[in-house]
Amino acid sequence: MKNYYLALIVSALLTINIFAEEVEEVVVTSSLTKQTVSDLKDPLHVVDGDDVKAGGIQSLGETLDELLGVHTADFGAAVGQPVIRGMSGSRVRVLENGVVVRDVAALGPDHVNDINLLNSQQIEVVKGPSSLLYANGGAGGVINVVDNSIATTNITERVMSLGVETQSVNNGEAVDFSYENNISGFNV
């Protein structure tokens, strides 16, 4: 009987040590822009802002139409909604600088996203369930349009841009003016 109690005490002490050595898994998420694409496991695609401006594209869906697994649901001039892996509408979240855009585009497929593509620095697309780390309800994917409205680095050269867009179908017009400069250490 003494051997039984001794074995029970020794096994209890050994199991305490086993439980003390277990460590929980820690998941760390960060901003989409601080890592290179090759470092990420998530299916992240980045479209450079210069490519967007050079293409003269009018809608967010049309901009991303060339990416694998992404196409546009075209509802007329400048109303191309992004479709990621067959999901659109409320299943695809649109963010601007990491903040969910709440506009009338979520109400119906024929409403345009209120995103200024002419001022975009880059467009980040996360597809699939990993997009739930960045916005709720976006099981299809998340599109983050990053602009330089809050500069993260010092501006080294003066840049001035003007964009004008017209649409003949609905007599729509859009004008964008952007000016960037560093004056005495202050980004303007």
Question: Which positions does each model-derived feature cover?
Answer:
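Cleavable N-terminal targeting peptides that direct proteins into the secretory/outer-membrane pathway or into
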Residues: M1-E21
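Extracytoplasmic
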Residues: V23-E25, D39-D42, L67, V79, ...
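N-terminal periplasmic "start-of-domain" segments of outer-membrane beta-barrel proteins
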Residues: E25-K53
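Extracytoplasmic beta-strand/coil segments of soluble accessory domains associated
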Residues: G61-D103, Q121
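Transmembrane beta-barrel domains of outer membrane proteins
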Residues: T63, R85, V126, V146, ...
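Transmembrane beta-barrel outer-membrane domains
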Residues: F75-A77, N113, S168-G172
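Short acidic/polar hinge/loop motifs at secondary-structure boundaries
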Residues: V100-K127
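Outer-membrane beta-barrel translocator/receptor signature
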Residues: N119-Q121, L132-V188
